[in-house]
Curated annotation (Swiss-Prot):
GO terms for molecular function: magnesium ion binding; phosphoglucosamine mutase activity; phosphomannomutase activity. Activated by phosphorylation. This is Phosphoglucosamine mutase. It comes from Francisella tularensis subsp. mediasiatica (strain FSC147). The active site is at S101. Belongs to the phosphohexose mutase family. Transmembrane segments: none annotated.
Length: 443
């Protein structure tokens, strides 16, 4: 079981958990030393979101890397997918993002990309963890690394997207965008300006403390309200580091990551094409049934965009994502990318020329009840055997009317209990039954 890494990097409360200056410096030194061992290019890229703690954590990371002899190129405040993009483009050994994604400002963390722009696999994460727990390694003084700033990183990213989609995007509707006071602030607006989009921007004034506060992809009520007030045709909501996207139609109705994937699947010719779709264990069964009916191959991965990516590569598909809004298109990038996904959607909406509401899956979705159960410590998957018989009982009662998923959080001591059924009260009752069993046997 991983000691530091969760499903999406390392994350926690600043100064009151793993996320300290000392740890972050050791992480930089560990990765730098590993780069030396593997004879990779002695050069990495770093970026950050808008949290007040981002600056001092970044420089702790840089000091550990420089001591190990690694040169650092700092992109400043940029969305996470920009770091992945630039890591590949500039042939860096690795890319780091100082971010806690959709979490509150008191948290922070580090996301880490390998040279191909992919999140680290489990084996490489274990190597990094072993190095963190080892000695701090200094290179000889004449081999210390350098530190440089690249001010125009977002311009390279925007130009790459524009060159691919300029001929498709001609959207005439009014758009509201919610940048979560995060890394997309000003950067997303620059991208939309490049395509000539008529938009109103909200939650785009970061002060270091307001990231994700009452806004962003995990608080869709903000964008729903704004779409109605502005009489807009579309709402786009990103999270703090802009690797998630949720959209809202002209009626203020949410379309989550599952719904976005379905739109991309129906118009995959505009998005570069795909032989199938990768969702996750959380993907609503209604979409799985829809893909099957339309002869679109569909695979469920474990939750986490790194696992979506692994299955995209394994099965040779190009498009995948999560209900939460991580959407990956391997025709362009290697990680969840809210900005690029937004442009793909604007291209589709431009070409199809119908209201956003008409792109939604018709009919009622299966009803999901998700309950987070706090635990005293992180639970391993083998611990779930203690409630296996209870899960089996629920599955028997549901029959072919639904399904059950128990999933330990990868970032905190929480067990997520999800029951999906064709009736909301049935899903809720069975979920509450399982929560009681979990509290009796695991808490």
């Amino acid at each position: 079981m991983a000691k530091y890494f969760g499903t999406d990097g390392i994350r926690g409360e600043v100064a009151n958990s793993t996320i300290t200056v000392e740890f972050t410096q050791k992480l930089g030194n560990a990765v730098g030393s590993l780069i030396n061992q593997k004879n990779y290019p002695k050069f990495v890229i770093v970026g950050q979101d808008t949290r007040s703690s981002g600056g001092f954590l970044k420089f702790a990371l840089v000091s550990g890397l420089n001591a190990a002899g690694i040169d650092v190129l700092d992109l400043g405040v940029v969305p996470t997918p920009v770091v992945a993009f630039m890591t590949v483009k500039h042939r860096a050994a690795a890319g780091f993002v100082i971010t806690a994604s959709h979490n509150k400002f008191t948290d922070n963390g580090i996301k880490l990309f390998s040279s191909n722009g992919f999140k680290l696999d489990d084996a490489l994460e274990e190597e990094v963890e072993d190095m963190i727990d080892g000695d701090f390694i200094y290179q000889p003084q004449f081999k210390f690394g350098s530190y440089k700033i690249l001010a125009n990183a977002i311009d390279e990213y925007i130009e790459s997207i524009h060159s691919r989609f300029a001929k498709f995007v001609n959207y005439k509707g009014k758009v509201v965008v919610d940048c979560a006071h995060g890394a997309a602030s000003h950067n997303f607006e620059a991208l939309l300006d490049k395509f000539g989009i008529n938009y109103v921007s909200i939650a785009s004034n970061p002060d270091g403390l307001n990231i994700n506060v009452g806004c962003g992809a995990t608080c869709v009520s903000n964008i729903k309200k704004a779409v109605k007030e502005q009489k807009a045709d579309l709402g786009i909501s990103l999270d703090g580091d802009a690797d998630r996207i949720i959209i809202v139609d002209e009626n203020g109705q949410e379309i989550d990551g599952d719904g976005i994937l379905n739109i991309l699947a129906q118009y995959s010719n505009i998005c570069g094409g795909t032989n199938g779709i990768v969702g996750t264990q959380m993907t609503n069964m209604s979409y799985e049934n829809h893909y099957r009916a339309n002869k679109i191959p569909f695979i469920r991965s474990k939750v986490g965009d790194r696992y979506v990516l692994e299955d995209l590569v394994k099965y040779g598909y190009k498009i995948g994502g999560e209900s939460s809004g991580h959407v990956i298109n391997l025709n362009f990038g290697t990680t969840g990318d809210g900005l690029f996904t937004a442009i793909q959607l604007l291209a589709i909406f431009s070409q199809a020329d119908k209201p956003v509401s008409e792109f939604k899956l018709q009919g009622e979705l299966m009803q999901q009840t998700l309950i987070n159960v706090p635990l005293t410590k992180k639970v391993a998957r083998e611990d779930l055997q203690k409630v296996a018989s209870d899960v089996n009982d629920v599955e028997k009662r549901l029959g072919n009317r639904g399904r059950v998923l128990l999933r330990p959080s990868g970032t905190e001591p929480v067990l997520r209990v999800m029951v999906e059924a064709d009736d909301k009260s049935l899903a809720t009752n069975e979920a509450e039954y399982l929560v009681e069993k979990v509290k009796q046997k695991l808490v």
